[in-house]
Amino acid sequence: MRVMAQMAMVMNLDKCIGCHTCSVTCKQAWTNRAGTEYVWFNNVETRPGLGYPRRYEDQEEWKGGWTLNKRGRLALKGGGRLRKLATIFSNPKMPSIQDYYEPWTYDYETLTSSPATDNFPVARPKSLLTGKNMTIKWSANWDDNLGGSREHASRDLMLKGIEEKVKMEFEETFMFYLPRICEHCLNPSCAASCPSGAIYKRAEDGIVLVDQDRCRGWRMCVSGCPYKKVYFNHRTGKAEKCTFCYPRLEVGLPTVCSETCVGRLRYIGLVLYDADKVLEQASIEDEKALYAAQRACFLDPDDPEVQRAAEAAGIPADWMEAARRSPVWALINRYEVALPLHPEYRTMPMVWYIPPLSPVVDVIKDTGFDAEDRGNLFAAIEALRIPVEYLANLFTAGDVPTVEGVLRKLAAMRSYMRDINLGRDPDESIPAAVGMDGETMYDMFRLLAIAKYEDRYVIPSAHAEQAHALEELATECSLEFDGGPGMYDSGPFGEGSGRPVPVAVENFQMLKDRQTSDTLAAPDDKATRVNLLNWDGKGVPSGLFPPRPDATPDRPDAGLTGGTGGRGSGA
């Protein structure tokens, strides 16, 4: 047994409202640079749909992920070393910019410099790649909310085998949202595909990163990743991908997409796994058994034998405590309601999903029946084959009974908790019907429905003694580069050349201090930083406004209109 730690995420798809807040904030934080205009580390897809890039799940075309060779051993679907060497200067399985979309801006100068005329000036779209006028034909979420579903959603590869049953008329279709980030797999095919060895998986927390210094822009990682979550920066000639916001995680903060999620659907936690089992379990022949095989790799943090092995492997005690409290471990192994995305790729992804019950509930509501009744929900899950089979194609390589079991648990939870919320005696036969007891089902409800911030994000901080092992951690002065303090080098392709902004863990430590502070304002040495999020609008918190000449120490808000003389009760 070789115990290793992995930071993982679970998303509850029933809570996703498709607002794209996670996508926008992620882009502003990580890819708001030249060369990454088309890059979305986080994107939200409407399903059924083509996804981003278009038809990325067609591995017969893109050759991503792993497959079993004639000897039953794992091999890259895109070929081994000889094939990659033969095509290293011209990768034939690269998605083109048309498979993503051509990024654009608008000619705003036409609007601002237009003289007074009888006609409204028009800002034409201009390509961010060529600078020429263009016609917008596609984008990262062009088919959002089933837009153009007759033409686009019908080409969704996950409808394979059930397409004759699916009708794309508005009255008969179904949909849900699927947020996607890098899976930070246990067996990443992108890392195995890189000829330069630039992609690596951190041993400390399992996050998969790209070493920008070693990357030579071969782009084999782009075609090797079956989820197409590795992108090529055409300004720097380097590959870039989701970083799981590692500088935030190192100080105990959740990722940007999780922090800003409106639906609070994301859970982040630590999972322990046996690294010696990964290759064996990923090589199982039956694709439908890969979900159970990956779960078999995970280790119970309450097992004394696992605890001893983890201590011998150098995993700190506070990380073991975080693993015991991990919501990800609970949703995957204790409640067994989370499923991996496309386990058939054999990469062992570590961003899991709770499949949505809403397509089934919506159908029951539309028929006028009670959508909270256990009998109605169970019958609908068995009768509505199209949504269930589609979810099985996404999350269990087509294993319908596993998806049905998860949906039955979610349906039972709805029915069981309705009785409790209405003051009725709880019906213990409801959780028993899905192999649970009432207390376990109530705990699952609390985690899925009303979990607090600290329950959804159980993130242990990095240890100082591991600082130099965390290769991307800034341990030198973050201002020491060409141009002086705060300046970036110009680079061969213009200012900054689209390079990522250097990060310093000190900045995220200050951010954590402000977000977890009990006071409205930061300490005296940073008095201008006021936490407006926790201000209820009553009174004037210290540091919000400059002091008035007539203010006294006991009345700092004297003379300010609307003040109540106190700093407010907070929120």
Predicted regions located by residue number:
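Non-ligating segments of multi-cofactor redox enzymes
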Residues: 1-571
